[in-house]
Amino acid sequence: MSKEKEEIKIIAQNRKAFHDYFIEETYEAGIELVGTEVKSVRQGKVNLKDSFARVENNEVILYNMHISPYEKGNIFNKDPLRPRKLLLHRHEINKLSGYVSRKGYTLIPTKVYLKRGLVKVELAVAKGKKLFDKREDIARRDAKRELEKQFKEKQLGI
């Protein structure tokens, strides 16, 4: 296997997290799933809306991540919103608990993806944005878009 960038297939993204939070740092975590949940994730039936993680008893638990029941799973299907354990190294968990203990910081999943056949979650340490921060970001984005438009028109000689 080459040392180049590994193949990653993104299953779900939490775009709203980038709008509602300042992302400080991201971590890659494995996730503890049962067989029918893995099959459902591979079909792309995952929703990260309103999901978050907490550090409890030196474990990171993910809440409110919706994985739709697998159609052919019948009795083996679990509750779609059940809490799921995230798999991280001890030093990463200690670092995350240090971040979360500070006021205003939380853990938000930003992506669910497949890496070498394994389901992974990108977990972000995030701080909530205030309303004026969101407006500021929108104004900055609009100004950048306007500048690019003017530059493009100038290049084309319009």
From Swiss-Prot:
SUPFAM superfamilies: Small protein B (SmpB)
Keywords: Cytoplasm, RNA-binding
Domain of life: Bacteria
MF terms in GO: RNA binding
GO biological process: trans-translation
Cellular compartment(s): Cytoplasm
Pfam family for this entry, one: SmpB
GO cellular component: a single term: cytosol
Main location: cytoplasm
PANTHER family referenced in this protein's UniProt entry, alphabetically: SSRA-BINDING PROTEIN, TMRNA-BINDING COMPONENT OF TRANS-TRANSLATION TAGGING COMPLEX
Record family assignment: Belongs to the SmpB family.
Biological function: Required for rescue of stalled ribosomes mediated by trans-translation. Binds to transfer-messenger RNA (tmRNA), required for stable association of tmRNA with ribosomes. tmRNA and SmpB together mimic tRNA shape, replacing the anticodon stem-loop with SmpB. tmRNA is encoded by the ssrA gene; the 2 termini fold to resemble tRNA(Ala) and it encodes a 'tag peptide', a short internal open reading frame. During trans-translation Ala-aminoacylated tmRNA acts like a tRNA, entering the A-site of stalled ribosomes, displacing the stalled mRNA.
NCBIfam families for the chain: PRK05422.1, smpB
Protein name: SsrA-binding protein
